[in-house]
Curated annotation (Swiss-Prot):
Name of the protein: Peptide chain release factor 1
Pfam families listed in its UniProt record: PCRF (PF03462), RF-1 (PF00472)
Gene: prfA
Transmembrane spans: none
PTM statement from Swiss-Prot or TrEMBL: Methylated by PrmC. Methylation increases the termination efficiency of RF1.
Record's function text: Peptide chain release factor 1 directs the termination of translation in response to the peptide chain termination codons UAG and UAA.
Length: 364
């Protein structure tokens, strides 16, 4: 049996018991931040701990059955104990694979909600229209999965679509579903204004951020520079007579977040802080992955925005994902939210990459 899995199972059970004991101590309610941290970790570890306990029990049963074989008084008895050992070993092997999938191969951010930042790239008006198409595609896919979604901020383009739109998607495992959408999406189609029928190529970029909770990313108010101004619509015209739009600059990193989608300044500030926390969490993830030598997995998993990941060819009605070499010829259905074929293929590639990294001893 894989000693790595045995060691991990024992550590998982021990840690889960520690967390259970801590949650049962009334004193923890005096520190709400600590309570939230422990409760979140306890919930996240529950399935892994249950699998680990069943795995260790199966190993114990296999060992005990094998120990009884030499003392058996008949061939039938020896075969019975051998059969018991084989059955327990088979269960242990199956559980080991589940543990590997749950605890080794799994991204710790998979259970989180997600923030998608969609921006028009090269291609002018067509890029803005394509950014709008991507937003509609993700919104419809979220609806199909029963996830909630809402626009946190948007900069509409005059011709339609968006120069930028930031969307929050809430649901169990939302990040695991959308995390592979990060990167540059390319569209090839004939613009409505093109009289010669020439195909134009445009791009839009998507950044995928696991939504950070307050307990994960602490922000010092002294590190923030907050400006307020009037909201504006397409073309820059004012759509609000009060200074409700908010721009927050995080001075230590230089990150800037603007939000003008809500009607009140307070709501826009809260939304901007949520986006800022998620960007800071993503930044921390990337820095950690770089330190651990995981840039290949990092770019695949969290979305290297410079990488062209997918091409949408309207004249041929096809979509190609360049990371897994998958081409489908139902472009309209995919833009209508039927993304499952891509998300399943990308999740399978991630699992294979993580397993390969684990087998070679690389961090993963």
């Amino acid at each position: 049996m894989d000693e790595q899995v045995v060691k991990l199972a024992k550590e998982t059970v021990a840690r889960y018991r520690e967390l259970t004991e801590e949650l049962s101590d009334p004193a923890i309610f005096n520190d709400q931040r600590r309570y939230a941290e422990v409760a979140r970790e306890h919930s996240r570890m529950r399935r892994g701990a249950e699998l680990s306990e069943r795995f260790l029990e199966a190993l114990r049963e296999e060992r005990e059955a094998r120990e009884l074989i030499p003392a058996a008084e008949s061939a039938e008895e020896r075969e019975f104990f051998a059969g018991e050992a084989r059955e327990a070993g088979r269960r242990a092997g199956e559980l080991a694979e589940e543990i590997r999938s749950e605890l080794i191969d799994r991204d710790p951010n998979d259970d989180k909600d997600v923030i998608l930042e969609i921006r028009a790239g090269t291609g002018g008006d067509e890029a803005a229209l394509f950014a709008g198409d991507l937003y509609e595609m993700y919104a419809r896919y979220a609806d199909r999965l029963g996830f909630r979604h809402r626009v946190l901020d948007a900069s509409p383009a005059e011709v339609g679509g968006y120069k930028e739109i930031i969307v929050e998607i809430e649901g169990d495992g939302a990040y695991s579903v959308f995390k592979h959408e990060g990167g540059t999406h390319r569209v090839q189609r004939v613009p409505k204004t093109e009289s010669q029928g020439r195909i134009h190529t445009s791009t839009a970029t998507v950044a995928v951020l696991p939504e950070a909770e307050e307990v994960e990313v602490e922000i010092n108010p002294n590190d923030l520079e907050i400006d307020v101004y009037r909201s504006s619509g397409p073309g820059g015209q004012s759509v609000n007579t009060t200074d409700s739009a908010v721009r927050i600059t995080h001075k230590p990193t230089g990150l800037v977040v603007t939000c003008q989608n809500e009607k009140s300044q307070l709501q826009n500030k809260e939304q901007a802080l949520r986006i800022l926390r998620s960007r800071l969490l993503e930044r921390e993830m990337r820095e950690r992955q770089e330190r651990e030598g995981q840039m290949r997995l990092a770019q695949f998993g969290s979305g290297d925005r410079s990488a062209k990941i997918r091409t949408y060819n309207f004249p041929q009605g096809r979509i190609t994902d360049h990371r897994v070499g998958l081409t489908v010829h139902n472009l309209e259905a995919v833009l209508g939210g039927e993304l499952e074929e891509f998300t399943k293929a990308l999740a399978a590639k991630e699992r294979a990459d993580r397993l390969a990294a684990s087998a070679t001893g690389s961090p993963g």
